[in-house]
Amino acid sequence: MAAAITDMADLEELSRLSPLPPGSPGSAARGRAEPPEEEEEEEEEEEEAEAEAVAALLLNGGSGGGGGGGGGGVGGGEAETMSEPSPESASQAGEDEDEEEDDEEEEDESSSSGGGEEESSAESLVGSSGGSSSDETRSLSPGAASSSSGDGDGKEGLEEPKGPRGSQGGGGGGSSSSSVVSSGGDEGYGTGGGGSSATSGGRRGSLEMSSDGEPLSRMDSEDSISSTIMDVDSTISSGRSTPAMMNGQGSTTSSSKNIAYNCCWDQCQACFNSSPDLADHIRSIHVDGQRGGVFVCLWKGCKVYNTPSTSQSWLQRHMLTHSGDKPFKCVVGGCNASFASQGGLARHVPTHFSQQNSSKVSSQPKAKEESPSKAGMNKRRKLKNKRRRSLPRPHDFFDAQTLDAIRHRAICFNLSAHIESLGKGHSVVFHSTVIAKRKEDSGKIKLLLHWMPEDILPDVWVNESERHQLKTKVVHLSKLPKDTALLLDPNIYRTMPQKRLKRTLIRKVFNLYLSKQ
């Protein structure tokens, strides 16, 4: 412990006495105002007291730093043998200590308790003796490694960190890096792996020595972390979507934007936040306000702009296309569709049930394909025929016009054959006219009668005395000659289907058999 404090004092004296090359970073720091001698002495006394306290903690706790497999760290709190620092590295360390002292003065002025929280470079030297390499600048061979840490190694096993931790790093075996002159901070620490190097920093920036001896200045990782946290907070408050907010889900709900619904009616500048409000405004102000029986749409850009109409309901339905309101919602559960007109809703609702029927029909062929047996094929054929019979006829040609045509033909047929008026519905009444007359050798007079309707009965010669009886002749429909009866009407002797004819014959034979018994 005494050797470490002596080395620290020698390091400070060398840093004050050694000249700095022009243009080096230390020259700018040396140009700053140095603190008074009394304050320096007080700070040195505080540093020595803190160093002794840390050494006592290290010796009592027995915490040792992890030394590398080919590195320069030793365990158990043993002091590491240090080589004599070069003038350039000593001057650089002195400059670093001057900067630390200036920063300590500023923190003492801002907070009375700041001096107790900060730790000097002597503490880092003593802490490094418990398991870290020296804070002196040394050049290492490619096969060797050194591990450096802040004052946090001595306190890690005793108390929890109070402030933000510095960067903790561990390198692989056989790596080489330059040691760090740490300015000290709140609980900054670094742990060295097997032959690895680790750097630590506190709240203030640390100086890292490169291989060529020039200091490399970098910002604390805590500052960058805090700035990142502030960016995330501002992003969350503004409602923007960031990858940090997504949490692996791929998307987040962004803040809803207010969409303005403007009324484009002539000489109307109203603006609304929703389409239902705009629709109510149009209906109450512009549609219901029109009087006189003539209704026009004065929406700017409308294809029927200023076109008069006598239907107010048409104008109300038409204005729904301008307002974008869809008040007619689907009544089927789970469907969120809405429509601007009731007709659109009426066309939409049956699609739900047609989809269900189609899904059932589509599931049936799958079941059929699974069992393509002969019995299944016969069953399918029967179902197909049954379905075909049960289906109604798509076309019905017996309409009113066809009925009028049949009635007209029946009237004409009755006028010629008198079936309904004189034949009692089953006989045809023929009327005769004399078309010829002759006198035979015996002196008798013969008359040639022609029957009406024509071409059904043949002409016949009768005696003149029989003329009065044969003016009319009634013939049953079944007695008419079949070759000429079709001329009377084609439906009288209509051909019967073969199956129906067989059925009729079987019934007649059965009735005849029953009558004989």
From Swiss-Prot:
Known function: Acts as an accessory subunit for the core Polycomb repressive complex 2 (PRC2), which mediates histone H3K27 (H3K27me3) trimethylation on chromatin leading to transcriptional repression of the affected target gene. Plays a role in nucleosome localization of the PRC2 complex.
Transmembrane residue ranges: none
Domain of life, source organism: Eukaryota
Major location category of this protein: nucleus
Residue stretches of biased makeup (Basic and acidic residues): 152-163
Region (Interaction with RBBP4): 209-294
Any one Gene Ontology molecular-function term assigned to this protein's record: transcription coregulator activity
Stated name of the protein: Zinc finger protein AEBP2
Modified sites of kind N-acetylalanine: A2
Composition bias type Polar residues, residue spans: 352-365
Gene label: AEBP2
Annotated organism of origin: Homo sapiens
